Amino acid sequence: DELISNLLMYGKTAEHSVLATLAELEDARKRGMPLRAAERKRAYRAVRELLELATEYGFNDNLWQNYLSFLLMMDENPFTLTAEKVGAGEGSVNRFVERDFHIFRALFRYDFGALERALGTDCFSVLTDYRALPKPAVRCYRAVSEKVRALSLSLAAAESDEAFFRTMSEFYRAYGVGKFGLNAAFRLEDDEKKGVLLKPIRNMDAVKFSDLIGYESQKEELRKNTEAFLRGQRANNVLLYGDSGTGKSTSIKAVVNEYYKDGLRMIEIYKYQFRWLSEVLAEIKNRNYRFIIYMDDLSFEENESE
């Protein structure tokens, strides 16, 4: 309806299929058009899509507010990209953002009662007070789920547009935006239509350095080198070698887990994917994070041809 059509900085959000469908149905209702079986089917299709998203990312309680929070977390626009890992600065762009957040606050409190009566369903009311079935952690993005639900509660509690703005600015400062903000590690995937994609690694083991017994001097060297890298100081490339089971992969995971909050991200690349490295660097070069390129299974045999 007119709320969504007035989004400017977050205008791409209005194109998301669930939000767009609900806006069209609400607009039709307000113009006095009858909502029959075909419209009800469209509503159910939108609800199903939202439920699929909720299952993938572990939404719970108020799925509608979780969904809106997720859209805000994922929208890479001039404001959010500037604010990632530093927070919102002072500038005229903030006026556009504040207007958009005023709309999102209204969407957070949106009353679906009239639309439900017109459609003859209560599906939207169910979404706003939802109890998800217990599911294994591997079925959803655990780390993303926690962030979505925490942000959703904070935004729902915002008593003013200014408080809403501060909450989102703090989120972008703490985590960033989009897939790089919400995820710590990535792998490459070759898509015939879209080319090379950076895909988040789901639910990476939450190991810490304390889980590695021994290797104290090696762990300390990794820490010092990583911290220098994060500060923008000179740091070395690192070669981890040793027999299978000696903690090489665990050390990498521990580094990423420990320094994720400081903006460290890891991209896993295999030997046969080296030809895509320039494309990867082009995608990440203007983002406000520090990336480790993790190359596994390197070989230094005399007859190695690659």
Q: What are the residue ranges of the model-derived segments?
A:
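Switch/connector loops and helix/strand junctions flanking conserved nucleotide-binding motifs
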Residues: K248, E302-N303
